[in-house]
């Protein structure tokens, strides 16, 4: 009976499809009505209906399969016919639900689903179950991974904490070991050893204090000597005769210095405030060596008394200067709101804050002492360098004094700077002058117009600053002059002391193939000399003028264009012709020699007169020196009057023979100085051949000077 009912349901499945559609439509309508009506909350939703339909279909399918299995043993033919309609169902899907016979009969009677629909539903349910299983497995894997990551992070954090704790423990152990080692290595010293160490420190401090005092005395004496040279103060001859080396020995004895040191710094076992207070006196003592140079000009009696009364007066002068600094808010170590202690540069708003900073940061300690020693070494190095430079300057001045250049008239007055420098040189070389000091003068140079000048505007109206041309005077090659001073001419706005022809020749000779175009010559001028980087129109015109004027420059046409070369033979011939061309010029050479000697003597007299205030005040000028100056003055005026009256004087009309006793090595007169005015000797008679050459060369240079 069960088999027949199953076959009937299968055969009539096509007829009941319409009924199924109507049933589903009714169910949908019911679900819509359930949604629309909010009052009937007991109605079944569409999801529950679908679930119920699936369960019913599954139950029906299971029942059919059971029937087919039971009937398949009896009728294999019917089993073969119904094999395409069988739906494979897994045992996992069959086990969970249990269908009662009554429910199975109701499903069969109602004929809700066809076998095809049942098969489709079973496949869908299998797919859904597979997806659920996959999702569950994926979710489990993710949870396991997250759990593993959390465990790993916790383990890493624990390991890091353990490592940090171990490192801290190791550091603490190392520190403890180091402290123990230090305690073992440095046992408590014996009281006698402590006293010895304190005595050694005190002795070192005393030695350092003595060095500072000696340096301060030297600086004060040097400043006093500078003021004495300039005539600002006067010292009796009894004191001026004292040598400089004996002055620093006029200080305190070692016992007095030690007592003074104890008064300033106190006992060595005092508190830090006392030490800092002692450091204030030290710093003021150190700084007073430089502040005394600035305040001594306004108050020279202070330095004068310091030399007379010894070191005690020096300390009192320093205290006075420090009080003056506090009132005037001026200190050598303080300027523009910044501490000028070496390597400090701390910003201080006012002078009081600077004093606090000076007492706190730069007290008497090892660091400040080391910095002071470094500063002493710096000063010593500078003094050594200064002495070398002074020796070089003295050699240069000696050389220039023995080989003076030809005097060139100019409306400009004498150069005061060179005069002061030569006067200092004469003071240093004079046997009666004061000993040479190793420091530069700190006071400004004052105009030396306190006495009557030997060279007056009425006697020599056209004597000016003398400009030398080394390459033309002594036949020194230009490269030897430019090579040592290459960086100077390259960076300084100073005109090189050479003619344009000499510079052009040097530019061409420095090139690889000994030939340059005009633009290359221009570039050499601007590259080598900073002076020619301005006023290009003026000096370029002069370069073109000299290239076309002189025969030693040859213009050559080649593939590149027009280049300029140098005919060295013509260049040397041109230089030799400038001496032998004019007989009148040769005739005037003795007169020029005499005039040069007279001018050299007059310069010496003027330099001697520039130091007359010092000599007159110190009593070092004797009658013989005054007589010599008067004789030189008369000889100079006589020689100048003779030259003015007879411009073409001969060698027999030269000045007196004692002027020739001055070892003057004079050079022949060269008429190639474009930027220098012509000599007084050549104003009366000069070569007409060279006159045209000079006018052509001086025209562009006059524009350059303007």
From Swiss-Prot:
Residues 379-400 are annotated as: Leucine-zipper. The keyword Acetylation does not apply. A zinc finger (C2H2-type) spans 337-362. CDD domains: FH_FOXP2. It is found in: Nucleus. GO terms for cellular component: nucleus. Residues 690-706 have a biased composition (Acidic residues). Disulfide bonds: none annotated. Residues 495-585 bind DNA. Residues 413-417 are annotated as: Ctbp1-binding. Keywords: DNA-binding, Metal-binding, Nucleus, Repressor, Transcription, Transcription regulation, Zinc, Zinc-finger. At stage 15, expressed in the anterior/superior eye field and the caudal branchial arch. At later stages, expression persists in the retina and in the caudal branchial arch. Expressed in the pronephros and the tip of the tail. Beginning with stage 35, expression in the brain is localized to distinct subdomains of the anterior prosencephalon, the medial mesencephalon and to lateral domains of the hindbrain. Residues 287-296 have a biased composition (Low complexity). It comes from the Eukaryota. InterPro entries: FH_FOXP1_P2 (IPR047412), Fork_head_dom (IPR001766), FOXP (IPR050998), FOXP-CC (IPR032354), TF_fork_head_CS_2 (IPR030456), WH-like_DNA-bd_sf (IPR036388), WH_DNA-bd_sf (IPR036390). Pfam families: Forkhead (PF00250), FOXP-CC (PF16159). GO terms for molecular function: DNA binding; DNA-binding transcription repressor activity, RNA polymerase II-specific; RNA polymerase II cis-regulatory region sequence-specific DNA binding; zinc ion binding. Residues 1-28 have a biased composition (Polar residues). Transcriptional repressor. Dimerization is required for DNA-binding. This is Forkhead box protein P2. It comes from Xenopus laevis (African clawed frog).
């Amino acid at each position: 009976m069960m088999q027949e009912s199953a076959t009937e349901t299968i055969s009539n499945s096509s007829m009941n499809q319409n009924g199924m559609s109507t049933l589903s439509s009714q169910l949908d309508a019911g679900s819509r009505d359930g949604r629309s009506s909010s009052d009937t909350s007991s109605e079944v939703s569409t999801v529950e209906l679908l679930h119920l339909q699936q369960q019913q279909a599954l139950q029906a399918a299971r029942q059919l399969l059971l029937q087919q299995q039971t009937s398949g043993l009896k009728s294999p033919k019917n089993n073969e016919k119904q094999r395409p309609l069988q739906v494979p169902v897994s045992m996992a899907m069959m086990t969970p639900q249990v269908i009662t016979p009554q429910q199975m009969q109701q499903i069969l009677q109602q004929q809700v689903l066809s076998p095809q629909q049942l098969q489709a539903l079973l496949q869908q349910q299998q797919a859904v179950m597979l997806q659920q299983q996959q999702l569950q497995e994926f979710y489990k894997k993710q949870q396991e991974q997250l759990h593993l990551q959390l465990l790993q992070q916790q383990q890493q954090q624990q390991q890091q904490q353990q490592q940090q704790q171990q490192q801290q423990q190791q550091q603490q152990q190392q520190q403890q070991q180091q402290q123990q080692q230090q305690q073992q290595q440095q046992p408590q010293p014996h009281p006698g050893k402590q006293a010895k160490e304190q005595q050694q420190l005190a002795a070192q401090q005393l030695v350092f204090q003595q060095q500072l005092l000696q340096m301060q005395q030297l600086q004060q004496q040097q400043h006093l000597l500078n003021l004495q040279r300039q005539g600002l103060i006067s010292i009796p001859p009894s004191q001026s005769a004292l040598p400089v080396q004996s002055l620093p020995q006029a200080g305190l004895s070692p016992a007095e210095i030690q007592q003074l040191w104890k008064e300033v710094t106190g006992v060595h076992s005092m508190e830090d405030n006392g030490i800092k207070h002692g450091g204030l006196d030290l710093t003021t003592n150190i700084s007073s060596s430089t502040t005394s140079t600035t305040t001594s000009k306004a108050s020279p009696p202070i330095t004068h008394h310091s030399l007379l009364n010894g070191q005690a007066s020096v300390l009192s002068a320093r205290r006075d200067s420090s009080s003056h600094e506090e009132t005037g808010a001026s200190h050598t170590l303080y300027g523009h709101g910044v501490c000028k202690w070496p390597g400090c540069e701390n910003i201080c708003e006012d002078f009081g804050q600077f004093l606090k900073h000076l007492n706190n940061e730069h007290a008497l300690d090892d660091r400040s002492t080391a910095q002071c020693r470094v500063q002493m070494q710096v000063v010593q190095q500078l003094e050594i360098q200064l002495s070398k430079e002074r020796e070089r300057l003295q050699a240069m001045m000696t050389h220039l004094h023995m080989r003076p250049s030809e005097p060139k008239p100019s409306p400009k007055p004498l150069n005061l700077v060179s005069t002061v420098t030569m006067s200092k040189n004469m003071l240093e070389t004079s046997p009666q002058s004061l000993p040479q000091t190793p420091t530069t003068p700190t006071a400004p140079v004052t105009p030396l117009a306190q006495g009557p000048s030997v060279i007056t505007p009425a006697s020599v109206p056209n004597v000016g600053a003398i400009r030398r041309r080394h390459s033309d005077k002594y036949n020194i090659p230009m490269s030897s002059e430019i090579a040592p001073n290459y960086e100077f001419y390259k960076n300084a706005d100073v005109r090189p002391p050479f003619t344009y022809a000499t510079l052009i020749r040097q530019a061409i000779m420095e090139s690889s193939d000994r030939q340059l175009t005009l633009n290359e010559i221009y570039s050499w001028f601007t590259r080598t000399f900073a002076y020619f980087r301005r006023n290009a129109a003026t000096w370029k015109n002069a370069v073109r003028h000299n290239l076309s004027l002189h025969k030693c420059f040859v213009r050559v046409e080649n593939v590149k264009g027009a280049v300029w070369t140098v005919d060295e033979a013509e260049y040397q011939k041109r230089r030799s012709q400038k001496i032998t061309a004019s007989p009148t010029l040769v005739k005037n050479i003795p007169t020029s020699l005499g005039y040069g000697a007279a001018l050299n003597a007059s310069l010496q007299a003027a330099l001697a007169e520039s130091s007359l205030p010092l000599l007159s005040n110190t009593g070092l000028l004797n009658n013989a020196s005054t007589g010599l100056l008067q004789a030189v003055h008369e000889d100079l005026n006589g020689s100048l009057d003779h030259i003015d009256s007879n411009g073409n004087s001969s060698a027999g009309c030269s000045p007196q023979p004692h002027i020739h006793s001055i070892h003057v090595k004079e050079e022949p007169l060269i008429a190639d100085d474009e930027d220098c005015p012509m000599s007084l000797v050549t104003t009366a008679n000069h070569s007409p051949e060279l006159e045209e050459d000079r006018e052509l060369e001086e025209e562009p240079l006059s524009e350059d000077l303007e």
